[in-house]
């Protein structure tokens, strides 16, 4: 690659590091082109998977202020730049790595913080953002119903007591 081409590639990688919410470094040694295409498909629109040169990646990461890849840039390396939900991308990578052991998840960056491969796997075990928000809303709604019941219970109990007294007086008369 000529120097102007390298400078353009570094600038592009730097911009991808800055604009993505997460980046996951993988080793793809032993994967075929068809398998790499299947990996890109499994990641969907939430991530862009690119095979990159280690030296260019190191320079771009340094320019973007990322030092998480120190010592990780060796061998055939590819990066998944996550633009959408990091959980969905982590699930896609984890599932593909289970089916294809040749894919090795090395490390990553999430919101500017370094994460290990085990943390990426733990991230994949989380439910999606929408599911977590729905569960939180459901729990909040349940607490509101419980509070409403607690506020109305004394009044309804008083009404039932008065009705029971009326019936008792009506039976006595």
Curated annotation (Swiss-Prot):
Gene3D superfamilies: 3.30.70.1730, 6.10.250.290
Sorted UniProt keywords: Ribonucleoprotein, Ribosomal protein, RNA-binding, rRNA-binding
GO biological processes: translation
Assembly with partners or alone: Part of the ribosomal stalk of the 50S ribosomal subunit. The N-terminus interacts with L11 and the large rRNA to form the base of the stalk. The C-terminus forms an elongated spine to which L12 dimers bind in a sequential fashion forming a multimeric L10(L12)X complex.
PANTHER family recorded: 39S RIBOSOMAL PROTEIN L10, MITOCHONDRIAL
Family of the protein in this entry: Belongs to the universal ribosomal protein uL10 family.
UniProt name for this protein: Large ribosomal subunit protein uL10
Organism of derivation: Beutenbergia cavernae (strain ATCC BAA-8 / DSM 12333 / CCUG 43141 / JCM 11478 / NBRC 16432 / NCIMB 13614 / HKI 0122)
Lineage: Bacteria, Bacillati, Actinomycetota, Actinomycetes, Micrococcales
Recorded name of the encoding gene: rplJ
């Amino acid at each position: 690659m000529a120097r102007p081409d390298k400078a353009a590639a570094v600038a592009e990688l730097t911009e991808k590091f800055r604009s993505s919410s997460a980046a996951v470094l993988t080793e793809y040694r032993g994967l075929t082109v068809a398998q790499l295409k299947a990996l890109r498909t499994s990641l969907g629109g939430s991530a862009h998977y690119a095979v990159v040169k280690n030296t260019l990646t190191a320079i771009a990461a340094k320019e973007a202020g990322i030092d998480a890849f120190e010592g990780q840039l060796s061998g055939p390396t590819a990066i998944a730049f996550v633009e959408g939900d990091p959980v969905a991308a982590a699930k896609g990578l984890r599932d593909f790595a289970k089916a294809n052991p040749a894919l090795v998840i090395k490390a990553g960056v999430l919101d500017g913080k370094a994460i290990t491969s085990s943390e990426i796997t733990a991230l994949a075990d989380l439910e999606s953002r929408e599911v977590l928000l729905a569960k939180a809303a459901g729990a909040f709604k349940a607490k509101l119903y419980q509070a409403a019941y607690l506020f109305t219970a004394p009044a309804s109990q008083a009404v039932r007591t008065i009705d029971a007294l009326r019936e008792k007086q009506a039976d006595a008369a």
